[in-house]
C-alpha cells in the first residue's frame, strides 16, 4: 500500500508541476507585442492626464486668483500628476518583462522614468504646499522656481532610448493599435 500511495503521490506531483509549467509558460514573460500593448495602454491615459494638468497649471499661473486659491489648485494639480504617474508606473510594472533581448533593462527603464516623473511632481507639490501666501510676489516667485525645477527634473527623467535596442519591441510599438 505504501508503495502505491508513494507512487501515486509522485505521479500527482509530476502532473501538477507539468500543469504549472504549461499554464505559466517557459519564462512567463509577455511577447513584445503583448508588452507594448499593455505599456501603451498605461501610458496613453497618463499622457492625456499630464497634458490636461499642464494646461490647468498654465491657467493657474495666469489666472486672477488669490495666492491661497492658486496654491490650493496647484497642490491638487501636482498631486494629480504624481498619482497619474504612479498609476502608469504600476501598470508598466504589472506588464512584466518583455520576452526580448534586454527585456529586464527595457522594463526597468520605463518604470524608472515614470518613478522619476512621479517624484518630480511630488517634490513640486510639496514645495508649493510649503510656500507662504501672505506676500503674493514672493509666492509666485516660489511657484515659478518650483515649476522650473519640475521642468528640469522632468526633462532629466526622460527615458534613455539608447538602451532600447530591441527590433521586436520597436516593431511592436509601431504596430499594436494601443500605441497609435
Residue ranges and their predicted role:
Residues 2-16:
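Bacterial N-terminal signal peptides that target proteins for export
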Residues 123-180:
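A charged, solvent-exposed segment within the mature domains of Sec-exported extracytoplasmic proteins
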Residues 22-25:
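C-terminal motif of bacterial Sec signal peptides marking the signal peptidase cleavage site
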Residues 47-50, 54, 85, 89-92, ...:
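A structural signal for well-ordered alpha-helices, especially hydrophobic packing surfaces
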Residues 28-79, 175-179:
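Immediate post-signal-peptide N-terminus of mature secreted/exported proteins
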Residues 86-111, 123-135:
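Short, solvent-exposed, charged loop/turn and helix-capping segments
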Residues 33, 37-38, 68-79, 104-111, ...:
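Short, charged, amphipathic alpha-helical segments
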Residues 59-62, 66, 94, 101, ...:
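Heptad-repeat coiled-coil alpha-helices
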Amino acid at each position: 500500500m505504501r508503495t502505491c500511495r508513494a507512487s501515486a503521490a509522485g505521479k500527482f506531483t509530476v502532473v501538477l508541476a507539468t500543469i504549472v509549467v504549461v499554464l505559466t509558460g517557459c519564462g512567463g514573460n509577455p511577447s513584445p507585442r503583448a508588452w507594448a500593448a499593455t505599456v501603451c495602454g498605461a501610458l496613453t491615459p497618463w499622457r492625456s492626464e499630464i497634458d490636461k494638468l499642464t494646461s490647468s497649471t498654465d491657467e493657474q499661473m495666469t489666472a486672477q486668483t488669490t495666492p491661497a486659491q492658486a496654491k490650493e489648485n496647484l497642490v491638487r494639480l501636482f498631486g494629480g500628476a504624481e498619482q497619474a504617474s504612479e498609476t502608469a508606473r504600476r501598470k508598466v510594472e504589472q506588464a512584466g518583462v518583455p520576452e526580448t533581448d534586454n527585456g529586464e533593462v527595457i522594463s526597468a527603464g520605463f518604470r524608472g522614468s515614470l518613478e522619476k516623473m512621479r517624484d518630480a511632481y511630488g517634490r513640486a507639490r510639496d514645495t508649493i504646499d510649503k510656500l507662504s501666501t501672505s506676500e503674493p510676489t514672493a509666492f509666485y516667485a516660489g511657484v515659478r522656481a518650483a515649476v522650473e525645477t519640475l521642468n528640469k527634473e522632468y526633462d532629466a527623467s526622460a527615458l534613455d532610448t539608447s538602451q532600447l535596442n530591441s527590433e521586436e519591441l520597436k516593431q511592436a510599438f509601431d504596430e499594436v493599435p494601443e500605441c497609435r
